[in-house]
């Protein structure tokens, strides 16, 4: 088959070529209709919007997005045209968990007794909540769609605003319908805060209204903001960037393990679509120094990944957002190391 792929999806081009396919790799932001005119399949990330404008009149019959989110895929159009598509749910949940852990530990030496609000308890949010409880935090979970489906133990967003020292956002981006998450954290949310929380957004930029967050920071309603995602990426609000405590270029999910998982998932879906056997991928490499001797979990997590380094890079060169994201040196997750706690 003729296949067009985003060149920044690791292992993908090589795996498809070894399976006998004709593959063209290019930047995701550059993919246009002429590139996919005679393609049978398309593999993308969030930067490639897949709808009528790109796909009308082309030969594309399969789209794989190597991401958890899929708001860049026009599902209705694909259904209308009989185009099969897949995403990679949960592929980088471990990486985003690692990011949130490192952000929290960079802010607090001791997390026991803190209250954490988790907005959205899907693959990522549920793992964040489980870790936080194990670390001794009081956790409040919010997820209206899951509450409507019968999940117990959930609270309102208002209760989280009233009770939490840290609030982290992990919902799917939904623009309309019964449970929209677009600007979920808006003027009313920030006005109802009671504990001047640390606010973390590693989901989608528009989940948090950037202008209202900036106003809340300026008024002291929010003590600090840790932002990995931004409205208008890659052209981000410079004033909000200046006020953000942690500011990274949409790389919370960028671990080698997460990228590997995503590629594996979309390849499996493509193989099922094409009616072929599985497509082989190489094993993940080991790390150079896998043994970590540390005093506590905090030391281990910040030793593996400290978000302040990426923050410095983005604040020093905000115009370089997309380049920093596309050329990010994929970090490794905790599972790649053997951790020994001293004493």
Set out the residue ranges of the language-model regions.
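Oxidoreductase and adenylate-handling cofactor-binding alpha/beta cores
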Residues: 97-113, 134-135, 264-273
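Rossmann-like adenosine-cofactor binding region
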Residues: 50-51, 146-238
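Rossmann-like dinucleotide-binding domain for NAD(H)/NADP(H)
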Residues: 196, 202-343
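NAD(P)-binding Rossmann-fold cofactor-contacting core
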Residues: 10, 134-151
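Phosphate-coordination loops involved in phosphoryl transfer and adenosine-cofactor binding
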Residues: 112-115, 196
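Glycine-rich adenosine-cofactor-binding loop
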Residues: 7, 97, 114-133
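Phosphate/diphosphate ligand-binding glycine-rich loop within oxidoreductases
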Residues: 40-111
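N-terminal glycine-/charge-rich "phosphate-binding" loop or analogous flexible N-terminal tail
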Residues: 1-39
């Amino acid at each position: 088959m003729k296949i067009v792929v985003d060149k920044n999806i690791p292992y993908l081009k090589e795996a498809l070529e070894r399976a006998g396919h004709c593959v063209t790799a290019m930047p995701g932001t550059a993919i246009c209709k002429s590139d996919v005119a005679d393609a049978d399949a398309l593999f993308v990330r969030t930067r490639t919007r897949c709808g009528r404008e790109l796909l009308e009149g082309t030969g594309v019959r399969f789209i794989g997005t190597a991401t958890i989110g899929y708001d860049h895929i026009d599902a209705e159009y694909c259904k209308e045209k009989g185009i099969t598509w897949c995403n990679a749910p949960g592929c980088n949940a471990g990486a985003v968990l690692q990011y949130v852990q490192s952000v929290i530990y960079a802010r607090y030496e001791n997390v026991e007794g803190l209250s954490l609000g988790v907005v959205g308890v899907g693959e990522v949010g549920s793992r964040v909540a489980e870790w936080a409880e194990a670390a001794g935090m009081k956790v409040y979970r919010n997820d209206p769609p899951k509450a409507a489906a019968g999940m117990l133990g959930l609270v309102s967003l208002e209760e989280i605003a009233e009770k939490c020292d840290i609030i982290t956002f992990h919902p799917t981006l939904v623009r309309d319908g019964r449970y929209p998450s677009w600007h979920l954290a808006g003027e009313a949310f920030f006005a109802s805060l009671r504990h001047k929380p640390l606010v973390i957004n590693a989901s989608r930029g528009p989940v948090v209204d950037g202008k209202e967050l900036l106003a809340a920071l300026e008024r002291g309603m929010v003590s600090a903001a840790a932002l990995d995602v931004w409205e208008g990426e890659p052209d981000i609000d410079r004033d909000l960037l200046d006020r953000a405590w942690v500011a990274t270029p949409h790389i919370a999910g960028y671990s080698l393990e997460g990228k590997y998982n995503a590629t594996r998932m979309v390849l499996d879906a493509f193989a099922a679509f094409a009616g072929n056997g599985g497509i082989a991928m190489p094993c993940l490499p080991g790390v150079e120094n896998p043994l970590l001797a540390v005093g506590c979990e905090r030391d281990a997590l910040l030793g593996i990944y400290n978000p302040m380094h990426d923050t410095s890079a983005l604040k020093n060169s905000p115009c370089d957002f997309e380049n920093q994201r596309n050329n990010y040196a994929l970090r490794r997750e905790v599972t790649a190391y053997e951790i020994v706690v001293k004493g």
